[in-house]
């Protein structure tokens, strides 16, 4: 109800407002509306009712509860379809908000008329079922209708007010717009209740006229049940099905009903009744009437629901709307629940054969022809019972008269079951033949039944079943309930306008359109789309002849409707209809096959059917056997004689046999003689015999005759209460008592069967006919008098005290006319009987005008009743609710109902009354083409020149619609009078307008006629002017026809001399009119008649520009072919291409460019086509233009570039496209992006991507600038929905910055950035990892350990974190002990480190760097090589994280692990998501980021060869102290970018990201290793030897923990000449290392820095299996790298490694390493493990703490898994990689934002606002002199390297990095490692940085390798004492190389390399070996930790 009320508010408001004119008019207050249908109905006369329910057409129908003034209630005809929708939506929302409370709304006020309880219940019910009854219309009358079954609602039997007001009956809903589900539901509930109390109330009833008796008794239960049943079960259909709970409430709800007379009745027999849809309420009611079978009977799905009566407000969040269509509930009294079905198999077989035949003339349907009682209905019902609607048979079949509903067996079978063939001895069935044939016939029947999707029974005594609107509505309702057509049901739910099209209201207005558009077209479309089964479907229609009894004066009967529609039926939708033999002519227009059931002589099968039935009856009843056996026994002879006698008498009538056997069974007929004389000879005699037995005396029949008269006269079944009141309405005194009435009714119970809705229906139509009419010669005994019945019904209506509703008024008129009681009085009284009848009706009701204008009476008018209404005083100029509130005359003129128009004109209707649109009846008739009505109206002096509100006269309307005859007539009419009066509008104007109208619509005949008008008088009649424009539209005939594409008219006009260049009023010539619409054929015609193809309009536009602007490709091509100039400009300087771009027509743009249009043309404002395309926002057009040479950085005169325009217009796809194409982000871009979060994300992501790219190339400084610039541009507020995305992006930027800072030896800043990231994302293990790395680099081991422990908690499985943790723990231990001399060098591994330890710290560092560089490089190379294949596979690595190195990557989807732990696959091609490479999260978080990000970020960059790399080897020479400032050749840039040598492998990050890239890390490595190896010093030592200076070996001192060694930057000169000796000898004990580092720091600040740089730069220089410089296989190195210790050899123990490494790491060296690794090893490297196992293995191998952090986790490993293990996360990598990662992962994001090429270091620093100096000092306390340099950007330049910044080496970044890698030192390698860790590692996944994993991984891997190599392989002494120079130097080199090598390789290496890094030599060898191994092992790191971090 709530919903109803809502609907009322919505609709009601509208409709009722509009309709208010009809009924009481007042709209209900909202609450009332809410109240429910009930309330509506009950509401006093509220039109609202009608409004509310969908069905109600007019409030008229609505049962106005209280007297309402006429005029108010009419509703608009067409309910806005949206009401339901709106109501549903609102209700849904309210339901969600209020939950169950909604139902609790106090119904009290709502139903003021009812008792509170009842009200509430009904309210609930109603609330629940908002559908209007109309929809649900059942076959029964509305509750308020006198005939309605529904109990009246009024409590008081006599209550006058209540009369209709309280009725909840669906009827009232009828009025409502929809079908009235609501009412229906309501009624159901009421009915249920009523039924419940029916018994009691009946007892209470007094005999008097008290209504109460009938009220309560009135089948409350039945209707309720029925309703409930149907609705609840079967009808889950109802819009809001009633929740079961309603049931209960309903039951309790209203026991009392309204007086019958108060109930609305259906239309008149003619069916013309105007009853509102309300009228349908009857139907509704019937539809929902309770089943007589009792609630217990299993109903469709009703079962359990019913029982729970707490249905109450379970509608909690309010049920979503259900279908608002309600099927009629049919009940066929002749078919009882005990009926059996015998024979007829041949019929089904024949039907099946005909429907399947290929003969189109007969396969569309079958007509079953037979006389009354021959079993037609039984055949239909048998198919229904076996069909999907079989459960409804329980409603259709009546209970047997003997069975009381209470005792119905719930489980009993459906009616019409076939009897068991137990009596096969006598039963031959109808099957002539064998069991096989019988089986086939049985199959045919079942096959037919399975195809049945809808059915309809026409019943003459239930008028609604005979009306076309109900037929259409019912069929649609059943179709959508058919399981085979669920797609149709879904479509109706999806498209509410279809439901509104099928609402009863729409069906009344235009049943053909409703059926065609609501049923046939949707089904046809669904069938074409293969959404419904590809099989035949069948609709069954029984009793077409019955519908003819209610044929309307205007409109179709069901059979004529089908005859018109059958041509539109799809071939797979078949009909099976039945018709009586006497009326079979009505079906002659149906192209169906006919089957006759009454040709007994011709068809042996009929005889066998009869025989089988006789056998069945005799064998199933011992009584029959006893009564027909002559001597107590039955022999075959007797049987044969009897059966042949009965068959002969029956002539084929099953009904005759059934009734005869019933008489025999009951003993009324005893056949003791063989003459069988006692057997009645016909059906008529059977009825006579029955009546004689029932009414032995005439007086006994006279007692019941009035009841029969009323039943016969009624239009629909009446309840006992209604009949009782009607009987008493005929007597003034001495009324019949209720008990007496009940006795009489009991006597009639065998003839008037009580239906489930408690109404009474004749047992069979033939009995009803027998009571009314007899054939000649038949006895007239028991003949009834229908006139008397009509009289009683008319009196009953007249004596009702409340106001009758429209439907009842129409019925009253019908009964008055049929009663004709004044016949013969006119002469006596002197007054015409028609006047007296008019007085009668006028005294009986007030709503005459509303009744006259009711929807049904408008569309299917009853002329006689309408005349009576007019005589009674109805307003003939009454405004209806249709056609813009047009007067009745307008509507009838529009519909073409000549008799009604004549009637209205006869009574003086205003001939010029207009609707709200200004149209008069003449205009409507002319527009519809009804010449006869036009003539009638013109005779009544209708104004010919009347203009409607659009300025159109009747002549124009006729011309617009092509009605030539009407045009001719109107032109010949007399216009003089009107013309003179108006003075303005003349006939000539009208003719000119008519010419234009006809030309525009293509009516050549009218155009020709108007041009050839005879000119009788030049002055008065002007012929139409062919070149003039009209005064209405301002068009000439040619411009109008050309613009509408009317080719024939254009030809005609040109032939008649129309000027081809004649413009219309707006100055447009025909050529432009037609070009604008794209009619190239007419363009051709005009050009052939001399039009200029390059003609320009006022704005200078040519036809080509117009066509391009409108996107008409065909016309553009045609014009170009005709020589149109492509270079012409309009007045603004725009060309055709400019226009096409401005409107985004790609196909036209392509065509114009292909034809030579200039893509760089600038208009007068300097805007190129690209500017205009960017403004429009079509990315494809932009892409096309850029690909075809458009200047992407073109600036127009207002200083705007295409990118700025796209940003300003928020065209994200264009922004992404332009950024991908290299557009620069300038100040204007940022300004335009303000307050556009989606654009900001794209731009920031682009910056990030650029930073990642620089980082990958090792240009850490540039990368830092980018990140800092991005942070600077970060919006300060207003993130809105994108808050999470921005936060993730910022975290990634901060982590990336931290990584870069660390690589730049600005440890303080690095730490601060990581801390800021933690503030934003406290649970970020990547941030902890990054901070730990920064702290470790600045030798705050304890603090680093703390952060690592936090990280490992957050991500326990992260190997990088575990590795680093081990190292840091080891370093802490080492710091605590005085520096211990490094363990004796292990074979070769340690030797290099130890050998040189003391000689020179610097040297050592350099050596280390060299080693690391070479080994790393080699490893990287090797790894890359190995990786190449595996890189793609790497499971864990989020590929996405690194920007694609090469274009191929773009295509490949990158997978990145999301921080959440889920992997995301990014297709870089797709431009939808923008994630920073670093963070997956980004991508996932904000797909908004924009495709651009993905694409551009990930777009692989072409491989670059960095000069350094190109050189065969890198020459690392530690720069002098100041060297740090110098830029070292970086290891090969990202593999992609590298020269062929380096191309082999991208950094691991990239690798992972780019697995698909052509430049695979492997290849890169291979090339690198191949080319470099030869050139490289054979061993890092040799490189060191080459270095210009070597650090003197400092005494080994315990490194001070507090002291942060600033890595000395060793200038590693990659020389082609190996210096093995030096390298090998350089091994510095740990202590020495520390000291050296310290002293070096002070001595060589810059050199340390340099060293650091080189160290970090260490590239995995794995040769593919090559030997490291000194000849050792790179594999080992690679392995160690992977493991995280680049130089560690297997020989080295983990502990050793850790010690050395830890000091080394702590030392400046370490820092340097980090950068190197970071760069080359993206997180992807480390993480890249083929499997977790690999990672684990590698981690174990790496062993060193550093390694641990480096340890790759399989990137593929689930981030979730990783997450669980906090240790896994590699915070180190994380910080950097995160940043980087972020960019890679949100590839698009990073790429998208292009940082300004130059970032000032200061600016980047500023962004973070972290004091560099403090950071430096902190990090480089020990190296104080150096630290400033390192920390300071000034020295940074030197180290700008490929190092991935913060591990952010997006693929792109990496790719780009690589090229730089060669050039730059790998200082960033370490940071890469870090990077790797953070985002890449799965643990990190959660963080957005996880996106970057690939790059991070590689970085990490490098880093790890580097660290491992440096720390592990180099002696710790070396590390420390040289200040890590060695590490930085040799290792750095190695690392650098590693980093340079593809990240993947690094990762692999990391995995594969042993942790032992003790000796550089070993390391180198290992590296070379490892690199080989790396190559060998797929580098698909699963998602190395780094990767995930990244």
From Swiss-Prot:
This is Protein TANC2. GO terms for biological process: dense core granule cytoskeletal transport; regulation of dendritic spine development; regulation of dendritic spine morphogenesis. Gene3D superfamilies: Ankyrin repeat-containing domain, Tetratricopeptide repeat domain. Glycans are attached at residue 1928. The gene is TANC2. The modification Phosphoserine is found at residues 169, 238, 294, 400, 1442, 1458, 1530, 1545, 1579, 1722, 1824, 1827. ANK repeats lie at residues 846-878, 884-913, 917-946, 950-979, 990-1019, 1033-1062, 1066-1095, 1099-1128, 1132-1161, 1165-1194, 1198-1227. Interacts with KIF1A; the interaction decreases in presence of calcium. It is linked to Intellectual developmental disorder with autistic features and language delay, with or without seizures: An autosomal dominant neurodevelopmental disorder characterized by global developmental delay, varying degrees of intellectual disability, autism spectrum disorder, and delayed language. Some patients develop seizures. Belongs to the TANC family. Changing residue 760 to C: In IDDALDS; reduced interaction with KIF1A; impaired neuronal dense core vesicles transport; no effect on dendritic spine location. It comes from Homo sapiens (Human). Scaffolding protein in the dendritic spines which acts as immobile postsynaptic posts able to recruit KIF1A-driven dense core vesicles to dendritic spines. It is found in: Cell projection, Dendritic spine. Residues 1783-1798 have a biased composition (Low complexity). GO terms for cellular component: axon; dendritic spine.
